[in-house]
Amino acid sequence: MIEETLLEAEEKMEKAVVVAKEDFAAIRTGRAHPAMFNKIVAEYYGAPTPINQLASFSVPEPRMAVVTPFDKTALRNIEQAIRDSDLGVNPSNDGNIIRVTFPELTEERRREYIKVAKAKGEDAKVSIRSVRRKAKDSIDKMVKDGEVGEDEGRRAEKELDDTTAKYVAQVDELLKHKEAELLEV
């Protein structure tokens, strides 16, 4: 019973780290990266659709991305979605592909993106701590109900704390790398 609770908590913490990784990947740096387009949604036959399902992405140069729609009729909508996104870019289309050139980030923009990254990192840590709290409550209830002994409960809480610390450290490490990437000129 306790092992199941600990495993479930660890899985949820792992998911929080994965979400943080995806969020960090979507934050723009000085370089073009296909993951930057993951959260952008375009209108496609009347339905909002993520553009990573409507096109392929390549990065021929460090500050340029090329978006190739699978369906040419979606070209204008994809271009508009990229233009309206918070990437701060002005895409150009030649009728077949969309070229997205990323201007050099100003120091002010870099600082803004670092703040965004820190907020996303904090969200991930709050999520991890929330999972810990729920698992701890579950363990405390098992001890109180007599399903497991107090020693077993303390051991499980120690293991839970170690797991929590491990995943919080992973988020901190991801954040540190993202900050370094953003400050790199």
Curated annotation (Swiss-Prot):
SUPFAM superfamilies xref list: Ribosome recycling factor, RRF
Coiled-coil stretches: none
Gene Ontology annotations for the cellular component aspect, listed alphabetically: cytoplasm
InterPro entries named in the record: Ribosome_recyc_fac, Ribosome_recyc_fac_dom, RRF_sf
Oxidoreductase in keyword set: no
Keywords: Cytoplasm, Protein biosynthesis
GO molecular function, one term: ribosomal large subunit binding
Signal sequence extent: none
GO biological process per UniProt: translation; translational termination
Subcellular localization: Cytoplasm
Region ranges (Disordered): 137-162
Principal subcellular localisation of the protein: cytoplasm
Cited PANTHER family: MITOCHONDRIAL RIBOSOME RECYCLING FACTOR PSEUDO 1, RIBOSOME RECYCLING FACTOR
General function of this protein: Responsible for the release of ribosomes from messenger RNA at the termination of protein biosynthesis. May increase the efficiency of translation by recycling ribosomes from one round of translation to another.
Family listed: Belongs to the RRF family.
Protein name listed in UniProt: Ribosome-recycling factor
Source organism of the structure: Streptomyces coelicolor (strain ATCC BAA-471 / A3(2) / M145)
